[in-house]
A protein has these predicted regions:
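Short, charged beta-turn/beta-strand-edge "cap" motif at the junction between a beta-strand
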Residues: 53-60
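A cross-family signal for N-terminal binding/gating loops and helix N-caps
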Residues: 1-15, 61-62, 81, 85, ...
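A broad, low-specificity signal marking well-ordered, structured residues that form hydrophobic/aromatic
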Residues: 3-4, 26, 99-100, 137-140
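Compositionally biased, charged N-terminal/linker segments
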Residues: 1-46
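Aromatic- and Lys/Arg-enriched surface recognition patch
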Residues: 64-137
Length: 149
């Protein structure tokens, strides 16, 4: 099993949106960064555990846990000219973008803010992409030690 952190803006798709979905499961679509796509497509497996991170908000941080419910498959929003994440260069016969389905596990008892996480950047969270300056990936790996911290 692997561990991940996935970011979303809470006003666009927050953890409460996931809870309200049928079976508390939803496709994680719209990823348009090749490095993040490659992790989703090549490394994420059903049952992998994920930190749900709220970004671009008053207090960004980890708000809950989810898991990979379905492994990577083509992101259909890339083919739809009406979709927000449409990519005219993406072709259904040779898809460029992929998504996974995620399933809600639970809310955390409290938000673990980015500010708090950064206080451990030289210790137990050293090397965690989230606490490095300038890291803007929406999907990133988490080591077992970082997960357990």
């Amino acid at each position: 099993m692997a561990y991940w952190l996935m970011k979303s803006e809470p006003h666009v798709f927050g953890i409460d949106h996931l809870v309200a979905c049928p079976n508390q499961t939803e496709p994680w679509d719209g990823v348009r960064n090749y490095q993040a796509r490659n992790m989703m497509r090549d490394e994420m497996r059903q049952g992998d555990q994920i930190f749900f991170y709220h970004s671009n908000c008053a207090e960004p941080g980890i708000v809950g846990l989810m898991e990979v419910a379905r492994e990577a498959y083509p992101d259909h929003t890339a083919f739809d000219p009406e979709a927000k994440y449409y990519d005219p260069k993406s072709d259904p016969s040779k898809p460029r973008w992929f998504m996974v389905d995620v399933r809600y596990v639970r809310h955390l008892k409290r938000l673990i803010s980015l500010t708090e996480l950064k206080t451990h950047a030289e210790g137990p969270l050293a090397g965690m992409p989230l606490v490095r300056q300038g890291n803007r990936l929406s999907v990133m790996p988490v080591t077992p030690a970082q997960w357990d911290f």
